C-alpha cells in the first residue's frame, strides 16, 4: 500500500491489521499513519512493529500512543526511540513504562527526559535505574526528582551521582539520602 492509501485507512479499521501486517510495514507506511490510527492500533500489533520503524514514528505519533501500547513495547523498541521521541512522550506513558523498559533506556534517552517526565517516574522505576543512567542525568533533572524517589536510590545509584548532581540536590533530597 502507498503512504496515501495507509493514511486513508479508517481509524476503526486499523484495529483489524494483524501483527504480521504491522511488522511488514515500511518506514514510509509507518510515517504515513495518522495520530488517530496510531492510537487505535492494538498494543500487541504495535509490539510487532520493527524497532527501526518505531524510531521513524513522528513525535506527534509518539504523543498519540496509549499507556497500554507503551507498556507492551519491547525493550528493543524503547531503546530505538530517539531523544526527541522520548522528550515527546506523555508523562502518563513514562509512568506506564515497565521496570525492564525503564532499565533499557539509554543514557542519551535519560538525559532527554523532561523534569515533568522524571517526576512522573515511580519510586520503583527510579530504584531500578542503572548507575550509568543516574550519572547521565543533568543537575536540573536530579533536582526535579521527588524526594521520596531520591530516598529510594540504592547505595550504588547514590555513589554514581557526580559532584554537579550532588550540588543540585535540594536540602530535603540530601536529607533523604
Outline where the language-model segments fall:
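General marker for long, soluble alpha-helical cores
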Residues: 1-177
Amino acid at each position: 500500500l502507498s503512504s496515501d492509501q495507509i493514511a486513508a485507512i479508517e481509524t476503526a479499521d486499523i484495529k483489524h491489521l494483524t501483527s504480521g501486517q504491522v511488522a511488514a510495514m515500511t518506514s514510509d507506511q509507518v510515517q504515513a499513519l495518522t495520530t488517530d490510527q496510531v492510537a487505535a492500533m492494538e498494543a500487541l500489533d504495535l509490539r510487532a512493529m520493527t524497532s527501526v520503524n518505531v524510531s521513524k514514528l513522528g513525535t506527534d505519533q509518539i504523543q498519540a500512543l496509549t499507556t497500554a501500547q507503551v507498556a507492551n513495547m519491547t525493550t528493543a523498541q524503547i531503546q530505538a526511540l530517539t531523544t526527541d521521541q522520548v522528550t515527546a512522550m506523555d508523562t502518563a506513558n513514562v509512568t506506564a513504562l515497565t521496570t525492564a523498559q525503564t532499565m533499557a533506556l539509554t543514557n542519551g534517552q535519560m538525559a532527554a527526559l523532561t523534569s515533568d517526565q522524571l517526576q512522573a517516574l515511580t519510586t520503583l522505576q527510579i530504584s531500578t535505574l542503572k548507575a550509568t543512567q543516574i550519572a547521565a542525568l543533568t543537575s536540573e533533572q536530579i533536582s526535579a526528582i521527588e524526594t521520596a524517589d531520591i530516598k529510594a536510590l540504592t547505595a550504588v545509584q547514590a555513589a554514581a551521582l557526580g559532584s554537579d548532581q550532588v550540588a543540585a540536590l535540594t536540602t530535603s533530597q540530601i536529607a533523604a539520602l
